[in-house]
Each structure stands twice: as C-alpha cells, then as structure tokens.
C-alpha cells in the first residue's frame, strides 16, 4: 500500500489599504459569492482551502489582514512565515495603488526575497471610476519584479486565475500552471481567536 504524502501547506497573506476588496476576493474564491454589505476586517481573519492537483493536494491558508492603520502593528508577524503575499489595491482609488509600494517594501523587509508577491488590481467592474490603468499596474509589477493581475471580486473576474497563478508559482508547483477551475474545492473555515467581523456599515461596496 502506497504511503500517504503529507499535505503541503502554504500561507498566503492578503495586504493592502482598507476597502480595496481583500476579504471579497477571498470570499469569492472560497464560496463563489459576493457580499454587497461592507464589513471591515478587525485584526486578522484566517480561512483555508484545499486545491486538488494532478498528483498531490495542497492546503492554502488564507490570512486576511485589516487595512486600517491601527492594526498595522499586527501584520509583520503574519508576513514573516508566509509563502505568498497578495498586495491588493482598488483600481478606482489611486492612493491605494500608490500605497502598494509601501506594502511590497514591508513584505521584503520582513521576508527579503524568500516570498512570492502578487500585485492585484481589484474592482475592475468600476469602469467609469477607474483611476489606475492596467498598464500602470503592469508597469509597477515589472518595476518591483512581482506578478500582476487585475480582478473583480464583484463580477468574479480573474479570481480563480489569480489563485492558479499563485499555485503555479509555489515551490515545486511549476508543472501546475494549467490547473483547472473545477479542481478547487472548499474545505474549511477557522476564525482565529483574535479576529472577528466589524459592525456592518451601510451602503454597498463594490469590493
């Protein structure tokens, strides 16, 4: 009887300013749904998802960080042992794009070059409100030597391709760049002891 290979686990930490859609990207990937009611992440939220690949299974541990300044002191400890840093900005909020430089630099200060960084321009559904072009996002990705992709959590655009791109870049995963959408299965939800959802705030958020 063949031995069972241990489940490879990879920690993904989501970073970026408040309201750029980090939680919405994770929710769309995990459950294929979008919540129009904005809820600010308080502290750190943790979810996990298993990806079944051709000859092995990996567990992605998704750490959703709060974008508010008062929680910034918590973030370095979560970056330190991460495999992937997903830096998100809102294409309709230029300041959030400019601030990605600080987030990327913070990751590199904590992890040097031993981490995969993905720059994500979210909310592409806000066509009329766009303030950051795809060319600018791609240029910044090239400038910092990181991967780049645009998404819309609201429309479900490029969410699974984002995670396939990440999976293909993981150590030993180079052969899985063509992982199929249907190979992704939801498995688990584990809130951390120091995380919770903030009070619901009125108004729709196209995150």
From Swiss-Prot:
Location, primary (coarse class): Golgi
N-terminal signal peptide: none
Keyword Membrane applies: yes
An annotated Gene Ontology molecular function: GTPase activity
Recorded topology in the membrane: Lipid-anchor
Alphabetical GO biological process terms: protein transport; vesicle-mediated transport
Transmembrane stretches, start-end: none
Modified residues (Cysteine methyl ester): 207
Placement of sequence motif Effector region: 38-46
Entry keyword set: ER-Golgi transport, Golgi apparatus, GTP-binding, Lipoprotein, Membrane, Methylation, Nucleotide-binding, Prenylation, Protein transport, Transport
Keyword Nucleotide-binding found: yes
Localization of this protein: Golgi apparatus membrane
Parts forming coiled coils: none
Assigned protein family: Belongs to the small GTPase superfamily. Rab family.
PANTHER family named in the record: RAS-RELATED PROTEIN RAB
Protein name: Ras-related protein RABH1d
The organism of origin for this protein: Arabidopsis thaliana
């Amino acid at each position: 009887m063949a031995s069972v290979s241990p489940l490879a686990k990879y920690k993904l930490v989501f970073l970026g300013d408040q309201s750029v859609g980090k939680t919405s990207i994770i929710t769309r990937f995990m459950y294929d749904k979008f919540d129009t009611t904005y809820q600010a992440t308080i502290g750190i939220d943790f979810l996990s998802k298993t990806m079944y690949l051709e000859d092995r299974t990996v567990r992605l541990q998704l750490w959703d960080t709060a974008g508010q300044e008062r929680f910034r002191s918590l973030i370095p400890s979560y970056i330190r042992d991460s495999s992937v840093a997903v830096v998100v900005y809102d294409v309709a909020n230029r300041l959030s794009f400019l601030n990605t430089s600080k987030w990327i630099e913070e990751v590199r200060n904590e992890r040097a070059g031993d981490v995969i960084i993905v720059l994500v321009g979210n909310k592409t559904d806000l066509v009329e409100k766009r303030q950051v072009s795809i060319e600018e996002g791609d240029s910044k990705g090239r400038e910092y030597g990181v991967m780049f992709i645009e998404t819309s959590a609201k429309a479900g655009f490029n969410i699974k391709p984002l995670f396939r791109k990440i999976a293909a870049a993981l150590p030993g995963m180079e052969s899985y760049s063509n992982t199929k959408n249907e190979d992704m299965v939801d498995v688990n939800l584990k809130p951390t002891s120091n995380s919770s959802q903030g009070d619901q705030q009125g108004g729709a958020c196209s995150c």
